[in-house]
């Protein structure tokens, strides 16, 4: 499958929204996560619409804080006009809020998992790729920072809520998206749980 000009345009739009944004607690440009998720979607068989939605999967959620004057409503219209209704619908399934400040983390994540329980397979593909990329990042960062990671990554959620959220997401994908992607996510979630359970014995510093 060749990716065309719509995909190029989606990359440009994502960079426009995320240009000033970094991964939580790091100096890593946020677009690195966007590209990582998109790569996973393609590696696990995604089509161009799914790849476009993966590129744009966080723009509606982050535009109010980082989008340099754009609004979620205007951005939704732009996505639908430039990339079609399918891409917009998939991005909406990936969005847990368009408000800034964001509502409380537990409330947002519970509602998002409920929405994913009704989501089409294309949205589940993107969501599972997003979780896989995040869990791999958490494993890498935990090995470096240990328990300090949770304060840096998401102090509102902390360790137990974060681990519980990824376990709940995994169980949803096991029920609704069986296959290689969910199998790989399960291996990584278990690896993260075991690493944390070891109490920092596998943490490398310096």
Please state what every model-predicted region is:
Residues 1-206:
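Active-site helical microenvironments for divalent-metal-assisted chemistry
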């Amino acid at each position: 499958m060749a990716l065309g000009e719509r995909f190029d345009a989606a990359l440009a739009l994502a960079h426009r929204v995320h240009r000033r944004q970094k991964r939580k607690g790091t100096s890593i440009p946020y677009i690195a996560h966007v590209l990582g998720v998109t790569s996973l979607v393609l590696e696990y068989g995604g089509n161009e619409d799914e790849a476009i939605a993966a590129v744009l999967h966080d723009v509606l959620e982050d535009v109010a804080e980082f989008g340099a004057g754009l609004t979620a409503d205007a951005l939704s219209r732009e996505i639908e006009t430039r990339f079609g209704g399918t891409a917009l619908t998939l991005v909406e399934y990936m969005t847990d809020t368009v408000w800034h400040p964001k509502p409380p983390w537990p409330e947002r994540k519970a509602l998002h998992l409920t929405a994913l329980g009704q989501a089409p397979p294309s949205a589940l593909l993107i969501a599972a790729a997003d979780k896989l990329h995040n869990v791999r990042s958490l494993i890498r960062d935990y090995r470096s920072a240990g328990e300090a990671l949770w304060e840096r990554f998401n102090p509102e959620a902390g360790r137990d809520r974060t681990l519980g959220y990824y376990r709940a997401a995994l169980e949803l994908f096991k029920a609704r998206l069986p296959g290689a992607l969910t199998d790989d996510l399960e291996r990584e979630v278990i690896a993260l749980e075991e690493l944390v359970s070891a109490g920092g014995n596998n943490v490398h510093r310096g």
